[in-house]
Amino acid sequence: AAIQECSEEEDRPVVSGPLPMHWVPAGPDSRVREDNCALVLAEELQGLQQEYWWTWTGAKLGYGKYNEGLAIFSRRPVTGADSFYISGVRDFSNWKTRKALAACTADGPAFLSVHMGWWNDPEENFRGQMERLQKALRERKLRPQDGSDSFLMGDFNSPAAIRGEGRDMVLDLGWRDSYEDAEIKDSGITVPGNIDGWRDGEHTGMRLDYIWTAKRHRVLQSKVVLNGISGPVLSDHFGVLAVIE
């Protein structure tokens, strides 16, 4: 599972004791605060006697008080995790700062969590961020061209219905859209209307969130979850569940 804008409040204490389940730091300075979203989820999963490996990294300051970050939870043992900038801006106080989080597992697959900027942003556009991401993945041999079994997941801020922009760029780089490959699928809509960043027009619904695969897999189903129909609404973006053989 990949989570974006997985936040903690900057003024909360840092956890000093051991973290639940299998915590994998994404760098030498990795730490979490007591109200960290990923930490709360890890504690809940542990209470349900589930076993997961998890990692988290902070990326930027949101709304003046939240450290908005990225998280990955894996049922497969994670052997290592790291995070890296994909934006030209690297200022924690600038809300346009963007990072990626990567987790590699013991038996091969790598999982990546990202929160991309907008295609037409004059300061931090999608194309530049995607190019930096691809460069970092090339160094780690995690691109489709590297033969990697990678899964690239997150909020891409790129409506699937718009041609010639973010989604098409990712496709051109060799990634496969699991929604399109799915044998069973729903509408795919992950944002039902206007939210922050998309208030310049009326939007009846957009598919902004994706699970991309580096290799061709048999995708049995792609389903929108946490949308009030399949699970409660938890965010202004719904979740995406892919069943992959």
Residue spans for each PLM region:
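An N-terminally biased module of ancient metal coordination in phosphate/nucleic-acid-related enzymes
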Residues: 1
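Active-site regions of metal-assisted phosphoester/phosphodiester hydrolases
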Residues: 23, 33, 46-47, 51-245
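Active-site neighborhood of divalent metal-dependent phosphoester/pyrophosphate hydrolases
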Residues: 4-32
